[in-house]
Amino acid sequence: MSTAAILPFPPLPALAWDADEPVPSAGTLMPTLADGVLLERVARGDADAFTVLYRRFERPVFGMLLRLAGGRRALAEEWLQEAFTRVWLGAGTHDPSRGEVRPWIYKIALNTARSEMARKRFRMPHVSLDEAGLDLPDERAGEKRVAAHLDEARRATAVAEALQRLPDFMREVIVLRCSRELSFAEIAEVTGAPQGTLKSRFHRAVASLREALGPEAGKAR
């Protein structure tokens, strides 16, 4: 059992975009340490190393979880907490010879989402503009700017809803490939599926999204 497994889990810092005070970035904390070195320190119970590792991955991992949660921020934050609890407790189990730290963390986060969705018999809801994580401009903004922002928000919501209608195995590969920009080799590490299968799923998912979105497909980013 790793040392970290018997130590109390350190409190996660506030999400960087929610914190009242500026939060030191990974670049100002242990800037020269690679992910693998940080994880080794985490395995020995180093809470500072854990904070740096968390800061490096919180945004992209949260973004992935938010999309898998259908835009439900509170749920994605809950999954993020659980995922990094597992990172802390399982730091000593990572085998550098079998893969890098990044896909290992994504795998933990994805498995967290999968298990939580299965446990709660999760069903994707209708995605509102707010749930899609879209900030509307201030009422005092110009009329054209507001209209343009709303148009963009509606397109993003249409994409989010189309994404949630995909089967889980298609949605996962789309989110990991397009939103998080992982290679198919990394996605294979995360999901456990062969690269050829993942590429097939990806192309089928893209075709399904284009069909579902119709004219919006060319506008959506």
Predicted regions and their residues:
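Intrinsic, short, N-terminal disordered tails of RNA polymerase sigma-factor systems
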Residues: M1-R44, V52-R56, R121-L176, L182-Q195, ...
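Short, charged helix-capping/linker segments at alpha-helix termini
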Residues: T28, R44-T51, F62-E82, Q195, ...
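Sigma70-family region 2
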Residues: A43-R44, R67-G71, E82-E100, R119-R121
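Hydrophobic/aromatic residues within well-ordered alpha-helical segments
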Residues: L53-F57, V61, W79, A109, ...
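Amphipathic, Lys/Arg- and hydrophobic-enriched alpha-helical face
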Residues: Y54-R73, L89-G90, L163, A212-P215
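Residues in the helix-turn-helix
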Residues: L75, T197, R204, S208
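Structural recognition of an alpha-helix C-terminal capping motif at a helix-to-coil junction
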Residues: E78-T85, G99-N111
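Arg/Lys-rich amphipathic alpha helix in sigma70-family domain 2
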Residues: L89-P96, K107-S128, E152
